[in-house]
Swiss-Prot record:
One of its GO terms (biological process) is cell migration. Homodimer. Interacts (via its cytoplasmic domain) with GIPC (via its PDZ domain). Interacts (via its cytoplasmic domain) with NUDT16L1. Interacts with CDCP1 and SDCBP. Interacts with DNM2; this interaction is markedly enhanced at focal ahesion site upon induction of focal adhesions and stress-fiber formation. GO terms for molecular function: fibronectin binding; identical protein binding; protein kinase C binding; thrombospondin receptor activity. Keywords: Glycoprotein, Heparan sulfate, Membrane, Proteoglycan, Secreted, Signal, Transmembrane, Transmembrane helix. The keyword rRNA-binding does not apply. InterPro entries: Neurexin-like, Syndecan, Syndecan/Neurexin_dom, Syndecan_CS. It comes from the Eukaryota. Belongs to the syndecan proteoglycan family. The chain crosses the membrane at residues 146-170. One of its GO terms (cellular component) is extracellular exosome. The gene is SDC4. Residues 171-198 are cytoplasmic. Glycans are attached at S39, S61, S63, S95. This is Syndecan-4. The lineage of its organism: Eukaryota, Metazoa, Chordata, Craniata, Vertebrata.
Amino acid sequence: MAPARLFALLLFFVGGVAESIRETEVIDPQDLLEGRYFSGALPDDEDVVGPGQESDDFELSGSGDLDDLEDSMIGPEVVHPLVPLDNHIPERAGSGSQVPTEPKKLEENEVIPKRISPVEESEDVSNKVSMSSTVQGSNIFERTEVLAALIVGGIVGILFAVFLILLLMYRMKKKDEGSYDLGKKPIYKKAPTNEFYA
């Protein structure tokens, strides 16, 4: 049983490594920007043909075809990546980078801060967080969530009590009708407890 588990673990590990290698493959971002591939319609690995490669290069029929390719290669080929591997993002002068110069647009763009009361001006406002559990000087019943919870809890409790009373009344009524015959003999008999001395 142990070799089967080891083999299954090995297959799982190889599948995970293959998937992580596949995730690191590079897709040309220019193709995505030009709109060749839409959402989910990325090219398949077999369909991608690099420059200088033709589809005939990959169609080898079997033994003997590989020898012809080795003879035509003179030296080691240096593979240059098609996409530069830097992370530089070019600055574009688009509509998002325009700074408004007209006074009317500047006024519309302003963010007006909230007014701070004179008592709170001395405190550090950036770290002040209003939490419902830290509110001081307020009654617990003034908060709406507490009132809602109390009302819902009361309604559920009253319904539970009503159903319990109805169940008890139903059982008492059934008992009065005689459906429970207490004078009935039991199905089993108790074994005699006589002791015999030998």
